[in-house]
């Protein structure tokens, strides 16, 4: 028990969360609203399932310098003469195939440069696009130096945001007066991009690079480099700017599917609708998975095989995600056993969360259940010790479980070790506690060494519409708590924020991608913060942000899914987080939360691949100089994303074996 170390914002000691971060909005609907939504959905008809497409692995391949999924995250490309990967990641000699998923830019331009209409000169890619049909004379003016204007500011993205490859081009958003046209200039060691865009109204200037150009930009920014972005605008013949930001690019593409619950979604049926949707990298809209009948409060297994969810006010169930569309029922329960379940990584069983009694009026104890039969699984060391284990989560390797230890007086995050062969739990350890609020939603990093979790000002965090939330990490071995100030939107270690005035303290319900990608861990969480000018928060009587708790189709900042990079092996005392970015493809009017990013099903031997983690064998290589395919374990060391048992198996010095895959930490910027 760590009652003397309640969570704090100032200093690394753990004290009560300051009042300035203790009043705002949680990411969850009120009990009355959610119960009404569930009841309305139940009365509307039988439980529905969406016509979702089958999970796709999107195998990409590239030859030479860092094909990286051919620009869109799921394509192919060829070109260049150097291996597409960092030192030790060559897979086929000087002219062999490079990884189509995560290779660094090699000698020569990445193929995505020419796909975007760019030109290669040596290793430098030069791209010019003019989607705004800006006149040549105006282009010349925009390239000149303008005057400073404090109102002309970046609203989104945030400075120093780390972007992975394979996602949609972000929507750049700016404050200030109206604009007739904008000029975006992005440079790196091997990139020179120029884009000219149409203007916008005051406070609502938005623009996006073409998807091909964004893919080329992401591919051209290598390890240790950044995309240096400058934006200039012109209005009435007067040029303003430039204003600048820098964006590091992770040397890898995220892949798989994000499953999340939604309220008020058009895809799910409109106002007062509920359901579970999914987004895949590069998709512009979500796809229905399960809609109506109260299908919310879900969890998805890390391997993408299993979904667990509430069905109605009194039932819950487990479902297979391996079909060629929609879901297939596996097991049902007449209580909340599968509601917010902590699923084992392979989805075959899970730990029931403590009952959400205010919504479901159940008294479900935290117990292990099979997702295939619904039967209770006896769990030695747990059944005799834990009754109330809230929001449980297994580590990616399945050897640990973290949960809210609600059997104790204070809300506490605890963890236990787990032996899957005997279904035995042991070694109960309290990791962090909050004396006057809530700590909840623990999620392990892929290496199992750290737990990311949410703090909240209210003990009824799951349904309280006047709750704050910030995210912290705790070291499993030392129980050292660290703030994630940068992710949460704070500047330094104070309470000042780089977000709009209403937005601090609105971050909830984190999960983690189960593998390291591009040298980082990746957190997915719900936030009620503003999304630039496209979705602004409003102030309540306390001057803090308010959620749309009663009107899912209003214009206030509903919960949205955001994503942020977390450093691997950050030094003690250092915030490991980076600024978050909005997960594109969501519906702006919907209230979205609890995103689970799961991996696609692995591919069998001989199937094309981009990296080892796409293969059931764990290895992706070129055979006889041909295309990359899944192969049996070769002799020698393991490349990035290939199988390993220890870090000594990894080819490159400094690479780590994380969740049985070799991972390369990011180079110094």
Q: What are these regions, as identified by a protein language model?
A:
Residues 4-6, 445:
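Intrinsically disordered, low-complexity Ser/Thr/Pro-rich tracts
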Residues 11, 18, 34, 67-68, ...:
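Intrinsic disorder/low-complexity signal
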Residues 6-28, 39-125, 667-669:
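Ser/Thr-rich, Pro/Gly/Ala-heavy low-complexity intrinsically disordered linkers and tails
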Residues 29-33:
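Sec-dependent signal peptide hydrophobic core
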């Amino acid at each position: 028990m760590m009652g003397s170390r309640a969570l704090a914002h100032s200093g690394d000691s753990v004290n009560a969360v300051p009042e300035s971060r203790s009043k705002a909005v949680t990411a969850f609907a009120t009990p009355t609203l959610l119960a009404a939504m569930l009841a309305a959905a139940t009365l509307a008809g039988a439980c529905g399932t969406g016509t979702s497409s089958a999970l796709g692995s999107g195998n990409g391949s590239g030859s030479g310098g860092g094909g990286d999924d051919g620009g869109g995250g799921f394509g192919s490309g060829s070109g260049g003469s150097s291996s597409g990967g960092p030192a030790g990641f060559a897979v086929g000699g000087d002219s062999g195939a490079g990884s189509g998923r995560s290779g660094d830019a090699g000698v020569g331009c990445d193929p995505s440069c020419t796909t975007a209409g760019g030109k290669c000169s040596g290793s430098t890619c030069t791209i010019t696009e003019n989607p705004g049909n800006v006149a040549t004379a105006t282009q010349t003016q925009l390239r000149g130096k303008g005057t400073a204007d404090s109102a002309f500011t970046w609203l989104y993205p945030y400075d120093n945001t780390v972007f992975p490859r394979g996602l949609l081009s972000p929507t750049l958003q700016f404050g200030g007066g109206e604009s007739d046209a904008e000029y975006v200039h992005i440079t790196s060691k091997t990139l020179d991009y120029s884009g000219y865009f149409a203007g916008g109204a005051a406070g609502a200037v938005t623009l996006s690079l073409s998807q091909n150009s964004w893919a080329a930009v992401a591919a051209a920014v290598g390890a240790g480099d950044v995309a240096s972005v400058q934006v200039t605008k012109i209005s009435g013949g007067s040029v303003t700017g430039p204003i600048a930001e820098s964006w590091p690019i992770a040397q890898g593409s995220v892949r798989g599917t994000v499953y999340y619950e939604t309220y008020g979604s058009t895809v799910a049926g409109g106002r007062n609708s509920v359901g579970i949707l999914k987004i895949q990298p590069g998709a512009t809209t979500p796809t229905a998975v399960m809609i109506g009948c109260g299908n919310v409060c879900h969890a998805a297994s890390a391997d993408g095989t299993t979904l667990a969810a509430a069905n109605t006010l009194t039932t819950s169930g487990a479902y297979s995600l391996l079909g060629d569309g929609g879901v297939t029922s596996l097991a049902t329960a007449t209580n909340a056993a599968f509601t917010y379940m902590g699923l084992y990584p392979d989805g075959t069983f899970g730990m029931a969360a403590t009952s959400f009694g205010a919504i479901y009026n159940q008294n479900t104890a935290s117990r292990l259940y099979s997702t295939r039969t619904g039967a209770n699984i006896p769990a030695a060391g747990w059944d005799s010790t834990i009754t109330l284990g809230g929001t449980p989560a297994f580590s990616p390797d399945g050897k640990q479980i973290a949960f809210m230890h609600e059997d104790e007086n204070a809300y506490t995050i605890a963890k236990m070790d787990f032996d899957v062969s005997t279904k035995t739990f042991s070694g109960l350890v309290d990791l962090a506690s909050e004396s006057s609020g809530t700590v909840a939603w623990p999620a392990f990093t892929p290496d199992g060494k750290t737990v990311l979790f949410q703090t909240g000002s209210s003990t009824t965090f799951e349904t309280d519409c006047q709750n704050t939330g910030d995210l912290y990490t705790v070291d499993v071995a030392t129980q050292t708590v660290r703030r994630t100030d940068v992710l949460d939107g704070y500047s330094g270690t104070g309470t000042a924020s780089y977000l709009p005035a209403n937005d601090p303290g609105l971050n909830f319900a984190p999960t983690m991608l189960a593998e390291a990608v591009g040298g980082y861990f990746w957190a997915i969480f719900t936030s009620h913060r503003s999304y630039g000018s496209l979705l602004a928060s409003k102030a309540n009587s306390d001057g803090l942000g308010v959620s749309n708790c009663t009107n899912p189709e209003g214009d206030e900042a509903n919960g949205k899914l955001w994503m942020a990079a977390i450093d691997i092996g950050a030094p003690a005392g250092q915030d490991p987080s980076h600024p978050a970015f909005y997960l594109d493809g969501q519906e702006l009017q919907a209230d979205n939360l609890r995103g689970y990013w799961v991996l696609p099903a692995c591919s069998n031997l001989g199937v094309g691949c981009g990296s080892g983690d796409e293969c059931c064998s764990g290895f992706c290589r070129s055979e006889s100089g041909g295309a990359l395919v899944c192969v049996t374990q070769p002799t020698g060391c393991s490349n990035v994303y290939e199988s390993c048992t220890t870090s000594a198996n990894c080819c490159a010095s400094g690479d780590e074996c994380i969740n049985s895959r070799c991972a390369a930490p990011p180079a110094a910027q």
